[in-house]
């Protein structure tokens, strides 16, 4: 059975970098996916699902939830790795509930933990505005992204805490310290 770890955190928390480094350090056993990459890859395949994804994204619309969850589960199941890290998901209560429903309806993938990389809003802001990835990384957009992250956060935290799946990792430290702690935690499930 595949072991799934969801990695969540504010914009600038380092969740993607952390997940990428852990997958790279453990390339035999761990795969890392981001939801956006999965949707783009599926779209590029021109499958029935891919064409549907393209129809929405080309119009600048959100891809329907069921399609996103199907795409995620399909990628997990087809991966040759036993441990899967997905960063930036869930971003909403609806995404959380949809994934939970799908995971409960099958027996190939088990959610082992939701790891939250926790940083202060000031740290997140410094990191995002300091790295200037593009025009969207300005202050107004940062605050909007932060709001989108924070609005459902307590409900998401409480849902996974009730299932004893929520783990907080202090993201205010060096990348090495964060990656080491997260990697040790993830690998503790493999034994």
UniProtKB/Swiss-Prot annotation:
Example GO biological process: AMP salvage
Residues reported to bind ATP: 12-17, 131, 173
Pathway: Purine metabolism; AMP biosynthesis via salvage pathway; AMP from ADP: step 1/1
NMP, as annotated region: 34-63
Catalysed conversion reaction: AMP + ATP = 2 ADP
A Pfam family: ADK
Main location: cytoplasm
Transmembrane segments: none
Any one GO MF annotation of this record: ATP binding
Stretches for region LID: 130-136
Domain remark text: Consists of three domains, a large central CORE domain and two small peripheral domains, NMPbind and LID, which undergo movements during catalysis. The LID domain closes over the site of phosphoryl transfer upon ATP binding. Assembling and dissambling the active center during each catalytic cycle provides an effective means to prevent ATP hydrolysis.
Family: Belongs to the adenylate kinase family.
Protein's UniProt name: Adenylate kinase
Underlying gene: adk
């Amino acid at each position: 059975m595949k072991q799934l770890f969801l990695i969540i955190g504010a914009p600038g928390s380092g969740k993607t970098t952390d997940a990428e480094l852990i997958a790279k350090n453990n390339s035999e056993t761990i795969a890392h996916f981001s939801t956006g990459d999965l949707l783009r890859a599926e779209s590029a395949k021109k499958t029935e699902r891919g064409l549907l994804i393209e129809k929405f994204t080309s119009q600048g619309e959100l891809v329907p939830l069921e399609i996103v969850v199907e795409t995620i589960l399909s990628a997990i199941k087809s991966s040759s790795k036993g441990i899967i890290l997905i960063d930036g998901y869930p971003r909403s209560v609806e995404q959380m509930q949809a994934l939970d429903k799908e995971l409960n309806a099958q027996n190939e993938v088990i959610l082992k933990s939701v790891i939250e990389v926790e940083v202060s809003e000031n740290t997140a802001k410094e990191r995002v505005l300091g790295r200037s990835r593009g025009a969207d990384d300005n202050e107004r957009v940062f605050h909007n992204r932060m709001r989108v992250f924070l609005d459902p956060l307590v409900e998401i935290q409480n849902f996974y805490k009730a299932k004893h799946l929520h783990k907080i990792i202090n993201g205010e430290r060096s990348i090495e310290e964060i990656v080491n702690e997260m990697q040790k935690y993830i690998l503790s499930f493999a034994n």
